[in-house]
Amino acid sequence: MTALPLLLALHSCSDCFGMALLDPQQPGADPLVQVHPDGRGLSNSLISRVQALLPPERWSQLQGLAVATGPGGFTGTRLTVVMARTLAQQLDCPLLGVSSYALMAPRLERQLPQSMQGEPFWITQELPRRGVVGGQYRITAGQVHELSLPTLLPQGASPQPAVEVQLDVEADVAQLLKLLQRSHAAGAAMPWAEVLPIYPTSPVGQV
């Protein structure tokens, strides 16, 4: 039987920081999932959180990394994307980037009427004083297709059908790890340089 790879997924697109680890050294090799309500303190706790889950002396054994690329808080998203890119570059390790909306799409689609499932739908989020951010998705045969990356929609736009963003970092970081495991098994290249954070609005406000 082929040995399981050592894989790590990071998600910080909300006030909670999520990590998921597939570690072949763990009994049963079930994924380890942790969620910490670090909020703005993530800038001080990020590295120590990762080190506590996976000691630095084992980082060179990583065979794949994944990170949620946003939308989310500017600082939190940027921190984990930068850390994941740096690790992937230094370790020559594949890096998968997935938007936070794409991660929640499978569970949000279940809120739609049965007749609409399998068809394109929108995930939207209203931001105070900014507007509505939306991305379009379609799920076929268990695969999430991101038809439109999350972006700030034109004022007054109301795409349908639409489901409001609902945060569940524990479920979504576990989904991210599952996607990483699937991509690793398929031999996907996953170059780190292509993974960038998604900022639908300017972090410095209106210009």
What residues fall within each predicted segment?
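Phosphate/pyrophosphate-binding loops at sites that engage ATP/ADP/AMP, CoA/4′-phosphopantetheine
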Residues: 50-64, 112-113
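DPxDG-like acidic metal-binding loop motif
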Residues: 64-100
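Short, conserved active-site loops that position catalytic residues or coordinate cofactors/metal ions
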Residues: 48-49, 79
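Oxyanion-binding and handling regions
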Residues: 1-30, 39-45, 96-207
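Catalytic-core segment of enzymes that process non-peptidic bonds
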Residues: 34
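Short, well-ordered alpha-helices that flank and scaffold nucleotide-derived cofactor binding pockets
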Residues: 52, 85, 89, 110-111, ...
